[in-house]
Structure formats: C-alpha cells, structure tokens
Amino acid sequence: MTKKDKKAKGPKMSTITTKSGESLKVFEDLHDFETYLKGETEDQEFDHVHCQLKYYPPFVLHDAHDDPEKIKETANSHSKKFVRHLHQHVEKHLLKDIKTAINKPELKFHDKKKQESFDRIVWNYGEETELNAKKFKVSVEVVCKHDGAMVDVDYKTEPLQPLI
C-alpha cells in the first residue's frame, strides 16, 4: 500500500451509541483523531461533536521503541515523571493540535482544572469560542490511571444558545 492509498482512507474510528442516544466516536490513534476534527470543521459540523481517544502518548511509545509490549509498568499516574511528561504533552502538543485541527489557533483554554485521586489524574480544559458565526464551547478531558500508560481523552463541543 502506498502512502497515497493510505491517505485516501478516512480516519479509523468506531461509533458507539450511548444509553442517552448520543453518537460517540472512539479513536485509537492521535493522527486519526486530529484528521476527524479537521474534517468536521470543514464540513461545518464542528459545534456538536463528541469523541474519545484512547492512546499511548508519543513519549511513552518513544521510550518503549514503539512497542506497546515494552512499556514500563511504572508509566502511570503514580509516577511523577510520567505525569509531568504527560502534562507537557497535553499542554504543548495535544491542545495545540486540537486548536490547529479546528482552525482556531488563538484558542486559550482558560477554564483549566486538575483533579487527583489515588487511582487517576484528570485534567479538564474548556473554552467558549466562535467559528463561522457559530458560538460553541470546547471541552477536553484528559485522564491517566494508576494501572497503565494508556491515556483517555474526551473531546466535546456544544453549541451555545444566544441569550434572548
């Protein structure tokens, strides 16, 4: 398969319908996730999106020489080094890539929260913005757990109703 054939395919994802009837897209690859967001922005469907990404951060795969079997057991929320590197990855790469994908490089994610418990760390990022005269809220939740290096990202956009 040539690179051209690979690019012709859409992002690899699965669609799940939640109990409340909401359609949820689930990704296992960061690149596919970003490609999907870019496509939704181009299709004008950007203000009502809910998708999840479950992946190993690039710095973890790099340390394991791109072999998930070689990921150290210490790469989890109990490791200060892992948490520090993950936070840097989220702030400097993931959020930046999301801004680029939805064509909003000036997005700042002012609404930031961090919740820590014994078994997980959760970072929440949120911001209200506007694109093509549509106001919407972007929410990103990043979770790392105590039992592995897999990171869960929950990306959600909701339209904001104008006040009348």
From Swiss-Prot:
Give the main localization category: cytoplasm
The compartments listed are: Cytoplasm
Which domain of life does this protein belong to? Eukaryota
Keywords for this protein: Cytoplasm
Q: Which Pfam families match?
A: RGI1
Instruction: Show the GO cellular component annotation of the record.
Output: cytoplasm
Induction details: Up-regulated under carbon limitation and repressed under high glucose.
Q: Where are the transmembrane segments?
A: none
Disulphide bonds in the chain: none
Q: Which GO terms describe its biological process?
A: energy reserve metabolic process
UniProt record similarity statement: Belongs to the RGI1 family.
| Further comment found in the protein's record | Present with 5530 molecules/cell in log phase SD medium.
Q: According to its UniProt entry, what is the function of this protein?
A: Involved in the control of energetic metabolism and significantly contribute to cell fitness, especially under respiratory growth conditions.
Quote the protein name from its UniProt record: Respiratory growth induced protein 2
Species of origin reads Saccharomyces cerevisiae (strain ATCC 204508 / S288c)
Q: What is the lineage of its organism?
A: Eukaryota, Fungi, Dikarya, Ascomycota, Saccharomycotina
